[in-house]
Structure formats: C-alpha cells, structure tokens
Amino acid sequence: MKRVDAILLFFLFSLSCQKLSLSNEKVVIATASNFLETLVTLKKDFESNHDIEIEIRSASSGILYAQILRGIKVDIFLSADEERADMIIEKKLARAGDSFIYAVGKLALWFPGSVCQLSTMSRETAKECLIQSKRIGIANEIIAPYGRAAKETLDSLGLPRTDQKLIRAENIGQTFALGSSQNVDAAFVAMSQLKKLKGSPSYWLVESSSHAAINQKAVLLSQKKAHEGAKLFFDYLKSDDAQRRIS
C-alpha cells in the first residue's frame, strides 16, 4: 500500500512540475506588422485557456528575418510572405515540417482624405483617384511583402511618374498610420487593417491578379530544448477556431 501511495505522490508531483514548467515559459512570437492586431486577439484567446504567457514582437518581415539571423530569441515567426519563412528553413533554423500557410493577405488601396470618397470603387476609378493623389503611402517593398505587392499593383496600373509621389514607410503598420493621420492622400494597406475602422472607408480591394499572392507562412523555430508552450500555440494557429478568427 505504501508503494502505491509513493507512486501516486510521484505522479502528482510530476504533473505539478510539468504545469509549473509550462507556466514559466514565455512564448516569443515575431509577427509581420499586418498581422499584429489579429495576433493580439489570438493571444488573449490562447492565454485564457493555457497558463502560458505570449510575448509579441512586431516589425516588417524583412527586419524580423534579419533579427532572427542575428540570434534574437524567437519561438515562432509569422512572416507576411513565404520567402523569408523558407529562408529561415534553408538556414537550418527551422524544419520544413514545422511550417504552414496561416493566412493569405488581401491588399487594399485606401483613400482616407477628401481626394476620393466613394462607397464602391473599380480598378479604373482607383486609377483616376491615384492620378489625383499627391502623396501615396506604401510599405518599403524591399523589406515588406505588402509593399512589394503594392509596387507590383502600381506597375500593373501603368501610371506615369508615380514614384515621385511615393511616401515609403518601414512596414504596413506605419503605412496605415500615414493614412490614419491623413499625411497621404492614398495608402496601400492590408484589408484586415481597414476592418477595424468605423464608418465606410473609401477603398479599392486590389484584385489578386495585380500582384503575386501574399501567402503568409508561419515557422516554428528549432530549439536546443523542446519548447512545449510554443508547440501548443503553433498547433492552436492551425485550429479551426483560430483560422475563423484569422479569416
């Protein structure tokens, strides 16, 4: 009987240690700027069901990639494209099996000021509004996938002398801020950012044929020691509940 009690006590002690270990873990997630608000919502939902703390770092995908290469502590990288996530795998910092497309981005051309206020907008209407615009906000296409998609869209529209009008921000979050403060007449932003605005913003939902697909890939970075909390959140991202919130 004493032996059974000892085994039971050992089992309960092991469970409490495991729970303590998980609760002490902090999962560090590096996310592209366009996904920040959605991730904050997912973080709250996850933390309400798990005794695990989530820390979020946000910047353009290019800057986050560079920081990861320099050795910054990151458990999960949520890139706004496939390219940089795949480069992390190529650098042997993550396994190909620990990655998946968590979202497909939608690009929108937003007219926050008085230049163009329309409830519905076609490609041709958006083109005319861009011609009238003196300042156009865009994320830096070198480091930000949404910026690259915006530049491809501008090229597809065939507008002359557009480069002179471009105001480049470091990431899509800063581009949205330019529009919100009306420091630009037009801004290429993520459609997910416009959903939080009150009223009916004037925008054109850019056709996917105007730019390369914005496939956003998540990677679980390899660790010397298995990080169970990070794995739990990574699996949560794949869940139907999380995907409903993302879409």
Predicted regions and their residues:
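Periplasmic-binding protein-like
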Residues: 75-79
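Sec-dependent signal peptide recognition
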Residues: 2-9
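Exported/periplasmic ABC-transporter solute-binding proteins
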Residues: 17-49, 55-58, 62, 66-70, ...
